């Protein structure tokens, strides 16, 4: 018996694994995939209502149900946050407020008055992000002249020129290109009400930026505003046509753009403004696709910002094999078959920097052939390497080849592109909505290392360089930054197992420092948690309410490092004692990251797959 079995009486780690495994198997679709809800914030729902209002396709039932969901997420002080139990967020609150006004909520209603008071106290509409002011400009409640300009002529910049569209991360370029169209057309379709209550009765001081690149970009923006008033007509027409062609070429089979909300919504707006009617097949596919991202339940109507079936499926496969499911189990064979069919076999934007690299990656979503990513591909390779399927081996080989070709110059790996590191993009006045480049990250690089190690490539130059990158990326306190998960717990939980798999000995200082950091940040209740505020405030690193997924990440690192002491036993006990009767765990806190500091995700399957992996490896003694 383990210590956990001795001290928990009727509930053991083995019991928890069995219950979680059975629950996960029940969630598999007949086709073989898994997909949990991808929960974000109410800007998705607010902007959906704004889109439909602008296009003239408002549905009263949908509006009422979306408003009900938005109200259900409002905090007692009248604000909305970007993640559960997070601080108020101004732009999110403004967009939610405007959406509720569209739904008929009176400005003098108590919940609206509280929201408006907060908004005014934070500087009002003038202090919001560019996206929010874009929406308000389209509805006549903000001046287009007061927005930064990114003209569609951007499409003419050659690929070697700074700030060409491929200098931006894939999610940013997909959003910026359609917004260049919207900003050039400058539509105004006034709302049926004013928003005076969202403006303070004083001038909001603007930050003074007069030196270096900031001053240069301010001057550039002034020049672009002058050009915007009198653009060269032939050049502008050609630029808009090129932008439209670029957008149309990237629409996916399901009607989406990149399988994510921002470029999807703005692409629909851009094409509509260029004359594509609501009955045009491209627009119709886009609108129909949004319906498939809609969830309706007792709380109302809400929109997923994205869907994660490939990611969820391979994490589920890895969890089930960690939990002892045989490699030839029908559920795993069915999942492997579905994953293999999802391989992206054509070129995408990644080909711009890697034109000679044959395709062979996987995307995050059901349909996203333009943008496979290294992180999903690494987890696919790990998952397929563990199961029995007649078509797995050639798919794995293509995935390994594609991953290897996506390495950046410094030996690390970004998510969607190689060497997407031009930090100048971050300085554009337009780019205040989150991360806009895709440099190598510790978690993605670690997953590649782990995948390659599973393929007996630990001694390859590629893996050695990646390991070297990870060693340099370790924080002075022993942790690693988490780009795609919250935050240092995720980064450390990803890197330590990868380094061990690559042959780094557990007694090495890099591993001992990581173990010490995790042990120092274990909470009194035995779990681990890290609040998303750690992305803006380093004092939160490793601190926050214990969650099932973050406790599992810490355990995965400690177990890989060979730890078997009290810290591990307390973490396992935390998971065993807090498991629900149905085999899963509660997790209201968001532990996924879209843009550090700006956009976060609650992956509803994380609370099941990662604890199952951790407990399964614990029982195996590894």
Model-derived regions: residue spans:
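Preference for long, amphipathic alpha-helical scaffolds in soluble/luminal domains
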Residues: 1-622
């Amino acid at each position: 018996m383990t210590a956990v079995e001795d001290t928990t009486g009727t509930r053991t780690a083995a019991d928890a694994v069995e219950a979680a495994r059975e629950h996960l198997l029940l969630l598999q679709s007949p086709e073989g995939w898994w997909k949990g809800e991808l929960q974000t914030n109410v800007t998705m729902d607010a902007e959906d209502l704004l889109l439909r209002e602008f296009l003239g396709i408002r549905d009263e039932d949908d509006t009422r149900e979306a408003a009900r969901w938005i109200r259900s997420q409002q905090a007692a002080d009248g604000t909305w946050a970007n993640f559960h139990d997070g601080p108020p967020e101004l732009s999110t609150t403004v967009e939610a407020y405007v959406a509720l006004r569209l739904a008929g909520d009176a400005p003098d209603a108590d919940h609206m008055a509280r929201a408006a008071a907060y908004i005014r106290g934070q500087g009002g509409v003038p202090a919001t992000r560019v996206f929010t002011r874009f929406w308000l400009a389209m509805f006549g409640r903000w001046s287009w002249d007061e927005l930064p300009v990114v003209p569609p002529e951007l499409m003419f910049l050659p690929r070697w020129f700074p700030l060409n569209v491929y200098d931006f991360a894939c999610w940013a370029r997909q959003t910026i290109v359609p917004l260049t169209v919207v900003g050039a057309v400058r539509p105004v379709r006034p709302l049926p009400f004013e928003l005076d209550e969202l403006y303070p009765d004083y001038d909001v001081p603007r930050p003074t930026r007069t030196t270096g690149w900031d001053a240069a970009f301010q001057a550039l923006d002034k020049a672009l505003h002058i050009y915007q008033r009198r653009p060269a007509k032939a050049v502008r027409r050609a630029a808009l046509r090129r932008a439209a062609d670029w957008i149309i070429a990237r629409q996916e089979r399901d009607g989406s753009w990149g399988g994510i909300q921002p470029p999807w919504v703005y692409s629909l707006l851009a094409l509509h403004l260029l004359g594509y009617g609501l009955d045009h097949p491209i627009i119709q596919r886009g609108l129909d696709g949004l319906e498939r991202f809609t969830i309706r339940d007792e709380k109302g109507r809400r929109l997923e910002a994205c869907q994660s079936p490939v990611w969820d499926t391979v994490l589920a496969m890895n969890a089930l094999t960690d939990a002892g499911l045989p490699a030839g189990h029908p559920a795993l064979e069915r999942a492997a078959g579905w994953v293999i069919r999802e391989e992206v076999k054509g070129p995408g934007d990644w080909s711009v920097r890697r034109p000679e690299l044959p395709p062979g990656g996987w995307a995050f979503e059901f349909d996203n052939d333009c943008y496979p990513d290294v992180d999903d591909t690494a987890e696919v390779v790990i998952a397929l390497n563990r199961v029995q399927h007649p078509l797995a081996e050639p798919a794995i080989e293509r995935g390994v080849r594609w991953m290897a070709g996506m390495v950046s110059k410094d030996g690390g790996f970004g998510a969607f592109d190689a060497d997407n590191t031009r930090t100048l993009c971050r300085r554009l006045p337009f780019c205040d909505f989150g991360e806009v480049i895709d440099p190598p990250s510790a978690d993605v690089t670690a997953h590649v290392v782990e995948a390659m190690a599973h393929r007996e490539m630990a001694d390859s130059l590629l893996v050695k360089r990646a390991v070297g990158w990870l060693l340099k990326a370790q924080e002075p306190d022993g942790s690693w930054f988490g780009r795609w998960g919250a935050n240092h717990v995720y980064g450390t939980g990803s890197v330590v197992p990868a380094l061990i798999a690559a042959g780094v000995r557990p007694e090495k200082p890099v591993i001992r420092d990581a173990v010490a950091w995790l042990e120092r940040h274990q909470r009194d209740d035995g779990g681990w948690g890290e609040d998303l505020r750690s992305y803006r405030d380093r004092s939160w690193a490793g601190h926050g309410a214990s969650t099932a997924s973050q406790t599992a990440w810490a355990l995965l690192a400690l177990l890989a490092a060979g730890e078997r002491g009290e810290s591990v036993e307390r973490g396992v006990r935390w998971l065993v004692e807090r498991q629900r009767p149905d085999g899963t765990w509660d997790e209201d806190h968001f532990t996924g990251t879209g843009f550090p500091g700006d956009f976060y995700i609650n992956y509803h399957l994380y609370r099941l797959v990662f604890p199952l992996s951790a407990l399964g490896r614990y029982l195996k003694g590894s």
